[in-house]
Amino acid sequence: MSSPAEYYKSLPPISKAYGTLCFFTTVLVQLQILHPLFLYLDYPLVFKKFEIWRLLTSFFFLAPFSMKFGIRLLMIARYGVMLEKGAFDKRTADFLWMMIFGAISLLVLSIIPLFNSFFLGIPMVSMLLYVWSRENPNAQINIYGLVQLRSFYLPWAMLLLDVIFGSSLMPGLLGIMVGHLYYFFAVLHPLATGKSYLKTPKWVHKIVARFRIGMQANSPVRPPANGNSGSGVFRGRSYRLNQ
């Protein structure tokens, strides 16, 4: 059995970075070093007082230390990691672009009063879960040792559990909506028409190449020649889901 340090080192880069940021943001809030009032999304504060960090920090606070926080962090560690190691194996730039597309979509939808959310971490995790469930629709999932179901239905089951435990329905539903929006334009529409409107931009490939984050097969951008190609920020090993 690998040690916690070895397990952490083996994680793919984007899921590792996002999960780490979510964990330490919650730790800082729990220690009262950070206050949630400085993190939540508030467009009047963003545009009138130029508190632009809120466009990012709203994605990193999942919940106070609780079962709800633990479940969401485990979803990143399990389903986000399996998605990045499986369907997005050797496609770090594509995975990063999915996260960026999801973040932008959530920020835009949050302008609409019906979809307004102060914290977008739970919608982002729900988006990852939805995309994973579409890529692996027939996997068997056991929920709390009580219910077994196909993974295709897992996002909806988690939505139902949110309602049962008294949480708001909207954050999870918002994540599912954005996840389907991504999956439609990235997978379903290209399969049906042969045309892709959600191709990973070259600047995302440049970020991955410049900072040597993970790996991108057939990248249009070459990484810098200097230094050891095995090093990098949040660099992890890649695995296939069906190994």
UniProtKB/Swiss-Prot annotation:
Highest taxon, organism lineage: Eukaryota
Keywords carried by this UniProt record: Endoplasmic reticulum, Membrane, Stress response, Transmembrane, Transmembrane helix
Disulfide topology: none
Stretches of the chain found on the membrane's Lumenal side: 42-55, 116-157
Spans traversing the lipid bilayer: 21-41, 56-76, 95-115, 158-178
Gene Ontology process terms (BP): endoplasmic reticulum unfolded protein response; ERAD pathway
Protein's name according to its UniProt entry: Derlin-1.1
Organism: Zea mays (Maize)
Gene that this polypeptide is encoded by: DER1.1
